[in-house]
Amino acid sequence: MTGFRSAVTRRQAIELIAMTAAAALPSVTAAQQRGPDFPKGAVIRALLKDYAPEDLAGGATLFHEHMSLGADFNQRFTAASAAARALNGPPPAPLGTPPAAPRAGGGGAAPGGGRAAGPGAPAGPNPMSDVSLMARELVDARNDGVACIVDGGHPDSGRDINFLRQVSMMSGVPIVAGGGFYAQPWYPTEISSMSENQIVDALIRQADEDTLGAWGEIGSWDEITADERKVFRAIGRAHVATNLPIFTHTGIPGKSALEQLDILEDAGVRPGRVVIGHLGNLVDANVYVHKIVCRRGAYVGFDRQGGGGDANVVPMVMSLLEAGYADHLMFSADTMRGYGKTLTVFLPKLRAAGVSDDVLHKIMVDNSRRWLAFVPKRPRKRA
């Protein structure tokens, strides 16, 4: 595909990288192009109300962030990450025949083509218990050009759905609640003994009671376990029953990305309803797995952006754009503060590399709405 690169002098590149937050909003929202078509009756289900997709066309939607996690999440995350690093062997061979194997990346990833922890992992004191503070964070994000944020928490990670409702009400920023079950280290003990049918029923109850707008982040922590496969199959079936879109967590992207997509497709999920997450951790100049995900119709989630891993991700994004996959990319930060950094830090680096505002608008505004919008199969239970 042509039209993504433009001549950029060194001085212009420096100026673009140095763009301030004030410049981020018009850069994302001023692109003049026809938006995507949505099915009749499609909504984006936020916690406080359902939105027509057109209502959120004025800014970016961040598809994977965190605004509520339990007080013990950091400790559990650190322990699970250490266990995964201890178990991971050498980097896996690429799944095709590109000349170089993928190397670890995405903010200090461990051997194995990525790790569970990433630059968006929480560290230090938990700031997620102050509604006013979090509301100010979202107001700042809105001023940076964010129209909507998807929270990737779950009951098993300590996500407080009422906290999110209060934050959305105070900030005026729509929050879409993800849900489901996270990954093996976080599963309730009864998951192992529950049947797949029982898990599907539990998921649908959760979607109704918590007013979910997506399933996610749904993860495999290291090698996909039997319980994780069962949960992924149940998520696929719950999607068929609800139409809610799905976004995933890949602990070792090179090993699990395509298997996750296989399981979901086998359960009846169309790939265009799925974002395979953390693929910035799979650093591969040939973007082999990334291209397969795109060709199959799913979205590649570069969702730990706005930090040190950007240097690895920008060339991969450029390769995917040049291959014609702009319609299959999603960007976010997977963070707990500073939610606008995808727009204010990462996008200027892409502009400096030659990406046009029209393409960035497609990715940040159109792709995310196309993925999030769904025609409900069940009535909204909570106003």
Located regions from the model:
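N-terminal secretory signal peptides
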Residues: 1-9, 22
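Disordered, low-complexity segments in secreted/periplasmic proteins that are enriched in proline
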Residues: 32-36, 82-119
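Divalent metal-coordination and catalytic microenvironments
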Residues: 64, 149, 239, 300, ...
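Metal-cofactor-binding active-site regions of metalloenzymes
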Residues: 89, 96, 116-121, 125-126, ...
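Active-site gating/metal-coordination segments in enzymes
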Residues: 166-170, 174-245, 299, 305-307
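Short acidic/histidine-rich active-site segments
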Residues: 248-249, 303-305, 326-340
